[in-house]
A protein has these predicted regions:
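Short phosphate-binding/catalytic loops that engage adenosine nucleotides
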Residues: 101, 140, 145
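Asp-based, Mg2+/Mn2+-dependent phosphohydrolase catalytic module
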Residues: 1-16, 44-45, 134-142, 155-255
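Short glycine-rich or small-residue beta-strand-to-loop segments that form or flank ligand, phosphate
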Residues: 17-20, 144-148
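Compact structured core domains
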Residues: 123-124, 137, 145
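Conserved phosphate-coupling serine/threonine residues in phosphotransfer and NTP-handling enzymes
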Residues: 23, 151-153
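Residues that cap or flank secondary-structure elements
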Residues: 84, 128, 150, 181-182, ...
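N-terminal helical cap/lid subdomain that shapes the substrate entry/recognition surface
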Residues: 11-131
Length: 255
C-alpha cells in the first residue's frame, strides 16, 4: 500500500482530501481583496445609515488590518477562513439589519456587494499555489493516489481557482458547499469525496489549514488529519490535527 511519511510517521493512504483556500492556494492573496472591497462597501452603507458595526471591524469577518486599513492577515478560526459564502452573507446582513435595514433588503444589499467584490477577484485572478505543492501533487500522481478538494466555497468557484493555478487535472473529485447539506466541520463532504474516489474514509488523509478541516476528517473517520500552517509561530488552532506541516516538502510518498 502507498504510504505517506510525515515526521517519522508511516501513514497508509489510498486517497487525499485537500481544503483549497490556505491549503492549496495563498489565502490572503485571493480573498484579502474580496473581503476588503466587501467591508469597504458595507462601511460606506453603514455610514449612510448613521450606524456603526456592532463589533470592532476586525471581528466582523475575522480580519487583521494595518494602519492604512488594508487587510494584512486573518483569524484562521474566523468566518473569512471557515464560513461558506452564504454564511458570510448572513453574518454581514446582520450588521445592516442591526442598523435598521429590513432583512430582505440587507441580504440583497450584501449579495450585490459580494458580486462587486467577486468581479474584482475574477479580473485579478490572484490564485497562487502554495510553495512545494506542485511537486507534491506530481508525487501523488506518480504513486496513483487519487485526490479530492473539499471546500466551503462553491464547487464552480473552486474549479475556477484550480484552473487559474493550472492544477485542476490533478483532482478527481471537487466537493463544494453546494453539493452537501451540512458543510464543515460535518463529515458529509468528506464522505462524498471518498465515494467519488472509490475509497473508504478510513483509507483517506485530510490536509487543511483550519481546525474545521481536521474535525471534518475525524467526523468522517479518516485515517489521518494533517494540519497545514506555513507560519512558524502559529498552528495552535489545529487542535484536532494528528500532525502539522509547514511546507509540502515535509511529506514523502512511498509505494
Amino acid at each position: 500500500m502507498t504510504m505517506l511519511q510525515v515526521h517519522g510517521a508511516q501513514i497508509p493512504c489510498k486517497g487525499i482530501l485537500f481544503d483549497i483556500d490556505g491549503t492549496l492556494l495563498e489565502f490572503l492573496q485571493l480573498w484579502g481583496p474580496w473581503a476588503e472591497t466587501l467591508l469597504n462597501q458595507l462601511q460606506t452603507r453603514m455610514n449612510e445609515l448613521g450606524a456603526s458595526f456592532t463589533v470592532e471591524l476586525e471581528h466582523v469577518l475575522g480580519t487583521i488590518h494595518n494602519e492604512q486599513g488594508h487587510i494584512v492577515g486573518y483569524d484562521p478560526q474566523g468566518p473569512l477562513a471557515i464560513a461558506t459564502v452564504d454564511e458570510c452573507t448572513g453574518l454581514l446582513a446582520g450588521q445592516l439589519y442591526a442598523a435598521g435595514m429590513p432583512w430582505n433588503e440587507a441580504i440583497t444589499t450584501i449579495r450585490q456587494f459580494s458580486s462587486v467584490a467577486m468581479r474584482e477577484v475574477r479580473q485579478r485572478k490572484l490564485a497562487e499555489p502554495m510553495s512545494g505543492l506542485l511537486d507534491f501533487l506530481q508525487k501523488c500522481r506518480a504513486a496513483d493516489i487519487p485526490l479530492a478538494v473539499v471546500t466551503s466555497d462553491s464547487t464552480a468557484a473552486a474549479e475556477t481557482h484550480l484552473d487559474w493555478m493550472g492544477i485542476r487535472s490533478f483532482f478527481t473529485s471537487i466537493v463544494g458547499c453546494d453539493r452537501v447539506i451540512k458543510g464543515k466541520p460535518d463529515g458529509e463532504a468528506a464522505f462524498l469525496a471518498c465515494r467519488e474516489l472509490h475509497i473508504h474514509p478510513g483509507e483517506a488523509v485530510v490536509i487543511g489549514d483550519s481546525n474545521g478541516d481536521m474535525q471534518m476528517g475525524r467526523h468522517a473517520g479518516v485515517s489521518y488529519t494533517l494540519g497545514y500552517c506555513p507560519q512558524l509561530d502559529q498552528g495552535s488552532h489545529l487542535v484536532d490535527a494528528h500532525a502539522i506541516i509547514r511546507h509540502y516538502n515535509e511529506i514523502n510518498v512511498s509505494v
